[in-house]
Amino acid sequence: MPFRLLIPLGLLCALLPQHHGAPGPDGSAPDPAHYRERVKAMFYHAYDSYLENAFPFDELRPLTCDGHDTWGSFSLTLIDALDTLLILGNVSEFQRVVEVLQDSVDFDIDVNASVFETNIRVVGGLLSAHLLSKKAGVEVEAGWPCSGPLLRMAEEAARKLLPAFQTPTGMPYGTVNLLHGVNPGETPVTCTAGIGTFIVEFATLSSLTGDPVFEDVARVALMRLWESRSDIGLVGNHIDVLTGKWVAQDAGIGAGVDSYFEYLVKGAILLQDKKLMAMFLEYNKAIRNYTRFDDWYLWVQMYKGTVSMPVFQSLEAYWPGLQSLIGDIDNAMRTFLNYYTVWKQFGGLPEFYNIPQGYTVEKREGYPLRPELIESAMYLYRATGDPTLLELGRDAVESIEKISKVECGFATIKDLRDHKLDNRMESFFLAETVKYLYLLFDPTNFIHNNGSTFDAVITPYGECILGAGGYIFNTEAHPIDPAALHCCQRLKEEQWEVEDLMREFYSLKRSRSKFQKNTVSSGPWEPPARPGTLFSPENHDQARERKPAKQKVPLLSCPSQPFTSKLALLGQVFLDSS
């Protein structure tokens, strides 16, 4: 791949105009080194608590110190946290977890899984870890990055999702059974983000494997949404994937829509696709014209542009970061500062904030340790160097430690008004929140490489450049090296015979007898002592005694609340009267 292709990708933030803000209230910005170490300690407190109390379940329940499956029974937190380990510099634990995942994760299971969440967390997490494996000192196989065990796992998981795309419109169902495909009677109503958030992972997968089917279905889904926009250029919140009719016609940048816009921009940068960027810029005009008020973004009726809900949702806080990626720094900073005032008011971002009233919305007062405002701070700090952005990072560390930290990890904040906690630690806390905090305070991290160093890699298809920077984060904060997409370009029939044999060999399942979740008699899991974690010999015996037993609990299948519940909270819903 020509090195010049990395310039618009890797140096995008570095080339943006520089803005220099005022110092903090004490006359100086927070000390990055101090907060970097505190963020690292936060990560290991949460990570070790998961290993000791919850693995191999999906997530940790920090108040009861046990685990439960949520999105699909994949040991999800371990997959989501894997690339964060390397960003924090823990190569030995990264190497160990790669082996654990190969032995313990199975996608041939009778589970109804969210297509959206499985893609961004599992497929995205495995692809990122695969591309970072060599940097982490993993002994990669011949042909890497065009082959490898984590790539095969990512491909297997993605193939389990493909039946969801077999609809008349090409827009996917929201849920698929990993063993049987789409269940009879599955609801055809899917949120916009659940349709338009595949191009980053699926295009990467197609480029690495040589199978175009993944990128093809992702592009079709993107185009169908584009073709379904209203005459004033807006898209709604939920659509029927069988008929293509909008069911919920609320238009905005937040929950149910957010990552669709994000993936148009990131897909355009990753693939250097002018058409995707042009689509986003057209949406951006409509968003500014109809939803933006005093640097806030409201919800409006997608056909009329009339306000349906004057609230700020915490998920919308990704928007300033997205604006920074297209160079719109001034608008990004103004919106960011609006959101930061809400953080200062509550010590976190409530799920819903009523803008005219200046307070939380009933039943949406919680803060599940979401990353979006921190993500925007990280992007904007890279572009501006404004110390105000470090102050947000400082405030986030202080708030989360003070309110959310418990003996077993960090608990979701159920209510920011009285600091009541909920018994859940979502995997994105380790995948996104902690990662973006660390990168905010670590300006020399390899993720921020400006192209001054790189690795030349020989593949079966020629030489390519990797590790030069310009990483594209998927919406779960899993970094993808865009140069990798140019390492494996070939036609399917041109693949080396040895690679075909390798795939055939690895299609045989590795033994998983050591890591069964459905039986207690399989024996305890005993993580070895490792540098950089808080797991000590003294608590090995305690971990053995607390080995969680498999519980029969329903899995989650939607990115947030059930469809009907969500619409009731969103306010007025506009149904098609035809």
From Swiss-Prot:
Disulfide bonds: none annotated. Residues 1-21 form the signal peptide. It is found in: Endoplasmic reticulum lumen. Residues 517-557 are annotated as: Disordered. Glycans are attached at residues 90, 112, 289, 450. Transmembrane segments: none annotated. It holds the Pfam family Glyco_hydro_47. GO terms for biological process: carbohydrate metabolic process; endoplasmic reticulum mannose trimming; endoplasmic reticulum unfolded protein response; ERAD pathway; mannoprotein catabolic process; positive regulation of retrograde protein transport, ER to cytosol; ubiquitin-dependent glycoprotein ERAD pathway; viral protein processing. Expressed ubiquitously in all tissues tested with slightly higher levels detected in small intestine and peripheral blood leukocytes and weakest levels in brain and skeletal muscle. Residues 538-548 have a biased composition (Basic and acidic residues). The keyword Cell division does not apply. GO terms for molecular function: calcium ion binding; mannosyl-oligosaccharide 1,2-alpha-mannosidase activity. GO terms for cellular component: endoplasmic reticulum; endoplasmic reticulum lumen; endoplasmic reticulum quality control compartment; membrane. The keyword Glycoprotein applies. Keywords: Endoplasmic reticulum, Glycoprotein, Signal, Unfolded protein response. Its main location: endoplasmic reticulum. N-glycosylated. InterPro entries: 6hp_glycosidase-like_sf, EDEM1/2/3, Glyco_hydro_47, Seven-hairpin_glycosidases. Gene3D superfamilies: 1.50.10.10. Involved in the endoplasmic reticulum-associated degradation (ERAD) pathway that targets misfolded glycoproteins for degradation in an N-glycan-dependent manner. May initiate ERAD by promoting the first mannose trimming step of ERAD substrates, from Man9GlcNAc2 to Man8GlcNAc2. Seems to recognize and bind to exposed hydrophobic regions in target proteins. Belongs to the glycosyl hydrolase 47 family. This is ER degradation-enhancing alpha-mannosidase-like protein 2. The gene is EDEM2.
